[in-house]
């Protein structure tokens, strides 16, 4: 009986360990991403809306992402509140500024991250069958 119990425990540990290890690694990756995004402020360094470069419309905006899933878009004394989330496995980041006008409402998409570094992120999203491109740089 003891031998069978031991074999069952061994069997369970061998087959559940990789799953829990993978979840642990994923959790660590998510924590690293959140720490990276929430430390410091960001600016839009490129926004291409279909074929039109509208980067200049974001001049002066600073974005502060917080670990609780909120983000502020700040220009001068005006702050616009929004939310954000990231999916490490899908390599996406989503933002939503529900009460925003242009240009901030143009950020209200799920963006596929195409390139990322500790101080910059490049992403794209499909809108009306055409890609919009976004680049953020850390201030």
What do the predicted segments below correspond to?
Residues 1-21:
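Sec-dependent bacterial lipoprotein signal peptides
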Residues 22-85, 89-139:
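Lipid interaction determinants
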């Amino acid at each position: 009986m003891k031998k069978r119990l031991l074999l069952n425990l061994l069997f369970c540990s061998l087959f559940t360990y990789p799953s829990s290890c993978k979840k642990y690694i994923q959790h660590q990756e998510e924590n690293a991403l959140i720490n990276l995004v929430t430390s410091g402020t960001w600016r839009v360094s490129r926004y291409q809306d279909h074929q039109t470069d509208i980067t200049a419309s974001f001049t002066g905006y600073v974005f502060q992402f917080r670990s609780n899933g909120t983000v502020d878009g700040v220009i001068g004394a005006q702050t616009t509140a929004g939310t954000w989330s990231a999916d490490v496995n899908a390599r996406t980041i989503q933002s939503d500024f529900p009460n925003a006008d242009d240009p901030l409402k143009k950020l209200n998409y799920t963006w596929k991250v195409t390139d990322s570094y500790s101080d910059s992120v490049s992403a794209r999203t499909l809108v009306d069958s055409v890609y919009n491109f976004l680049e953020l740089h850390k201030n």
